[in-house]
Amino acid sequence: MTVENAIAATGITLPEPPSAGGNYISAKTVGNLVYLSGVISRDEHGVITGTAGLDRTIEEGYAAARACALTLLAVLRRHLGTLDAIHEIVSVNGYVNAVAGFSDPPKIINGASDLLVEIFGDKGRHVRAAIGVSALPRNALVELQMVVAIA
Amino acid sequence: MTVENAIAATGITLPEPPSAGGNYISAKTVGNLVYLSGVISRDEHGVITGTAGLDRTIEEGYAAARACALTLLAVLRRHLGTLDAIHEIVSVNGYVNAVAGFSDPPKIINGASDLLVEIFGDKGRHVRAAIGVSALPRNALVELQMVVAIA
Amino acid sequence: MTVENAIAATGITLPEPPSAGGNYISAKTVGNLVYLSGVISRDEHGVITGTAGLDRTIEEGYAAARACALTLLAVLRRHLGTLDAIHEIVSVNGYVNAVAGFSDPPKIINGASDLLVEIFGDKGRHVRAAIGVSALPRNALVELQMVVAIA
């Protein structure tokens, strides 16, 4: 089954991919790697804001990380034409807007990792880092950066 | 027009490239990519210090990010001999020393992105992430990391 | 002398490599690069926790960064079979759990850089970034991410 078919089968709908808000671009192919700009957590209501350990729970963070991954897939579909062009997910860097001492960034970034494996299977397994930071664009709860390999 | 000519035409002068302060190096070529160490914001008076949202404005941050990009170009010129060896800018990671909840890291990192496009044109467009962090070396206002592709 | 022999000669023992705690993997080879997941600081007693500038000194941070580098080498040995397969260390990103305004992340990440050069010599010299962040997994003092090139 192709990835596009897998997405259709799950009923997952990708969001509209965002435009870059400055002199940068959303995706760049170099050789067989596609580098992606960091995207912030959004849903149909707008930016998912807040701070883990302050006014946001781990569950809300998990949903925000999943939303970031969906946005990155939307960016990739626009960039590549189809997600079936992706050979594998290489790396994910997840940044969580968090209070000092918040010890669960991984439980939040799991929202992205789980989605990628749900859609891509073993090829969706990636290396990653999960970091808590003091400030993200538009006060987003999560920012996610990714590199993927194409065939 | 070559990039070196473009820089000369704008009157931009690159700073002296910094030396690595430990057991690491400023730049490393692997295949057709050049990976660069993070550099902190400096001008002719020394390190540009401070914290966005506390004692530094967005405009000061923008200038600090631009200064980082100039420093990275100086590192690249030393590493490659000439900036004309650069095929394109691939990625920029910008870290802003920021108070918790500062929502404008992108407006600061634009200082780097705008400079890269000013000098390299479309080949200067890159993917990027803009993150606010609690602490940077020597209390710098901005740290910038970059990857470029060579011909 | 091979790297494995060099390690044996120094008496350094690598720790047990950690398992990935979710839908991600510890290492992934793409072309001649091996990307590694971020690892947190641990020793034989468990996670090395704490915050630089609050309850941890630079010396404790240096030891924690060195411990992260040892863990990453253990991951690489498991992934590649032998550390002799490594051609060179490419990049290191070091994140330090730090109070706002802590100005010495590089002195802490030197613990990793020094170890890599101790073991790999000139091939261990890498590009790097050292960043202070507000929160790391399990309240770890240091998290380290690395990319290496293989022959």
Give the label of every model feature segment.
Chain A
Residues 1-151:
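Short, polar/acidic, helix-capping and beta-turn segments at strand->helix junctions
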